[in-house]
Structures are given as structure tokens and as C-alpha cells.
Amino acid sequence: MHVKKGDKVVVISGKDKGKQGVILAAFPKNDRVLVEGINLVKKHSKPTQANPQGGISEQEAPIHVSNVMPLDPKTGEVTRVGYKVEDGKKVRVAKKSGQVLDK
């Protein structure tokens, strides 16, 4: 996958197109990511001991990884991801600026 947990991304298609967020979790087996504040769904919960009120809460649902693109740390624009080997390690590189995306 071209994005990882903690990456700042922009949604490039779907109902939340143009919105930015940080990846909270990645699910490589399903090719999906959970992005902060994106694809909010209403979750209905029954009253329980922990939450006696119950009710409706909003939470993020995963979206397909092809619908997000990482932000270039140098320019702040969306960018494609390339890969380079630096010091024997494979690192992700922003195609627009050549900046390393991995911390």
C-alpha cells in the first residue's frame, strides 16, 4: 500500500472528495484505510452498563486506498508515491518534490 498510519492524505473521489485527514489505521488485506473525519457513518448502540444512554454516534468507516493520495510534505499538494533505497532501506518518496515520506 502506498500510504501508512499517520500519513496526511486527501480524498480524491467519493462523497468526501477534497477533504484532508490523517490515516488512523490501515487494513492491507482489504486495501482499505481509516481516515480521521472522513466517511462518517451513524452507529446505533443499545443501552449497556458502560453506556446506559445508548443512542446514535458517528464514527469513521474505512474507505478504499485508491480513493486517497498522500500530501507532499514540501509543497502541501497531492503526490504520487515512488520508492528508493537509502542506506539499504526501502523508503517512500514523493514524486513531485523527491522528499522522503517515511519518518
Swiss-Prot record:
Record PANTHER family: MITOCHONDRIAL RIBOSOMAL PROTEIN L24 (PTHR12903)
Q: Which domain of life is it from?
A: Bacteria
Originating species: Bacillus pumilus (strain SAFR-032)
Where are the annotated segments for Disordered? 44-73
GO BP terms, alphabetized: translation
Quaternary structure note: Part of the 50S ribosomal subunit.
Q: Where is the composition biased (Polar residues)?
A: 47-56
Output one GO MF annotation.
rRNA binding
Q: Which UniProt keywords apply?
A: Ribonucleoprotein, Ribosomal protein, RNA-binding, rRNA-binding
Provide the function of this protein. Answer: One of two assembly initiator proteins, it binds directly to the 5'-end of the 23S rRNA, where it nucleates assembly of the 50S subunit.
Taxonomic classification, please? Bacteria, Bacillati, Bacillota, Bacilli, Bacillales
> InterPro entries per the record?
KOW, Rib_uL2_dom2, Ribosomal_uL24, Ribosomal_uL24_CS, Ribosomal_uL24_KOW, Translation_prot_SH3-like_sf
Which is one Pfam family of this protein? KOW
- Offer a single GO CC term for the protein: ribonucleoprotein complex
Similarity comment: Belongs to the universal ribosomal protein uL24 family.
Protein name according to UniProt: Large ribosomal subunit protein uL24
